[in-house]
UniProtKB/Swiss-Prot annotation:
Superkingdom of the source species: Eukaryota
Compositionally biased residues, Polar residues: 34-44, 165-182
Region (Disordered): 1-52, 128-211, 301-328
A Pfam cross-reference name: CCDC74_C
Keywords from the named record: Coiled coil
InterPro entries (alphabetical): CCDC74_C, CCDC74A/CCDC74B/CCDC92, CCDC92/74_N
Designated name of the protein: Coiled-coil domain-containing protein 74A
Coiled-coil parts of chain: 47-90
Biased composition (Basic and acidic residues): 194-205, 314-323
Species of the source: Homo sapiens (Human)
Basic residues compositional bias, start-end: 141-151
Protein's gene: CCDC74A
Keyword Protein biosynthesis (UniProt): no
């Protein structure tokens, strides 16, 4: 009991029970254990963040470079297609200018006058029955003089052609003619005339053909698919021609020489270091320009100063002599001032002698003036 009492007497007043003592010791141990670990955690967190940021930057740079490479490939592919289409457009215009009036006349003459005929595979056929012999002979005479006359539904009798077929054939013939003639292209000044003539001939043919096709297309189911295909091809060819002409106009307006483009292996994404180098170079050039401007200003000021100096020196000495006493009278004493009136009036008496003349008087006056000036300066 006495030992327990002594132990109880030694306890601090703030811990009446042993349970509270244990609770206070536990957090102290935890705090002591956490104190040495806190700087390690602080050091590890920024390192992890730096690694994650570097990985994300590398991934973004790779994506950026891949996207740039793909875009440049697409641009080159589109440029090649545009050049091909532009070449085809020019050759079609030249071929239409040469063979335009004769082809239009033949196509109009070969078409029958009645609205009951339908064109199947390039041959005009009546939907209810076989075609007459006149159409056979007319088609063979006009378009195929050396061929057979008994064919109706075959692909050999090409009496009327669709616009897409005519474009393809004319482009093929034009390529042959240019390869034989040494790739001689027409001048750009003649493109406008060719465009106007070709547009007029194409509009006349396209306006006549749909009227004849649409009259009996609903009755013949086999012809609808071919007509739709021909329309789609014609529309695609027209759109391509229009796009090429617009692109040609833009190129001619912008300039004859295209902009210089680096090849793909030399194109690399810009980095922060490159940007910093560029900024430093621009800053240095700016400083050099400012220094040059200051130097030029100083030269201009120096060239203007000697011009003002001779102007000041060109003033007469009489004015300096007259202005000098006025300025000096402020700082001089009374003794240095001009002499009184009595001294001025005192002059030697004139004697009636032959030596007295005007020259002597003038010399005396000059001597008096010199003395006065000497006194005023002192």
């Amino acid at each position: 009991m006495s030992g327990a009492g002594v132990a109880a007497g030694t306890r601090p007043p703030s811990s009446p029970t042993p349970g509270s003592r244990r609770r206070r010791q536990r957090p102290s141990v935890g705090v002591q254990s956490l104190r040495p670990q806190s700087p390690q955690l602080r050091q590890s967190d920024p390192q992890k963040r730096n690694l994650d940021l570097e990985k994300s930057l590398q991934f973004l740079q790779q994506q950026h470079s891949e996207m740039l490479a793909k875009l440049h490939e697409e641009i080159e592919h589109l440029k090649r297609e545009n050049k091909d289409l532009h070449y085809k457009l020019i050759m079609n215009q030249t071929s239409q200018k040469k063979d335009g009036p004769s082809g239009n006349h033949l196509s109009r003459a070969s078409a029958p006058l009645g609205a009951r005929w339908v064109c199947i595979n390039g041959v005009w056929v009546e939907p209810g029955g076989p075609s007459p012999a006149r159409l056979k002979e007319g088609s063979s005479r006009t378009h195929r003089p050396g061929g057979k006359r008994g064919r109706l539904a075959g692909g050999s009798a090409d009496t009327v052609r669709s616009p897409a077929d005519s474009l393809s054939m004319s482009s093929f013939q034009s390529v042959k003619s240019i390869s034989n003639s040494g790739k001689a292209r027409p001048q750009p000044g003649s493109f406008n005339k060719q465009d106007s003539k070709a547009d007029v001939s194409q509009k006349a043919d396209l306006e006549e053909e749909p009227l004849l096709h649409n009259s009996k297309l609903d009755k013949v189911p086999g012809v609808q698919g071919q007509a739709r295909k021909e329309k789609a091809e014609a529309s695609n060819a027209g759109a391509a021609c229009m796009g090429n002409s617009q692109h040609q106009g833009r190129q001619m307006g912008a300039g004859a020489h295209p902009p210089m483009i680096l090849p793909l292996p030399l194109r690399k994404p810009t980095t922060l270091r490159q940007c910093e180098v560029l900024i430093r170079e621009l800053w240095n050039t700016n400083l050099l320009q400012t220094q040059e401007l200051r130097h030029l200003k100083s030269l201009l000021e120096g060239s203007q100063r000697p011009q003002a100096a001779p102007e000041e020196a060109s003033f007469p000495r009489d004015q300096e002599a007259t202005h000098f006493p006025k300025v000096s009278t402020k700082s001089l004493s009374k003794k240095c001032l001009s002499p009184p009136v009595a001294e001025r009036a005192i002059l030697p008496a004139l004697k009636q002698t032959p030596k007295n003349n005007f020259a002597e008087r003038q010399k005396r006056l000059q001597a008096m003036q010199k003395r006065r000036l000497h006194r005023s300066v002192l």
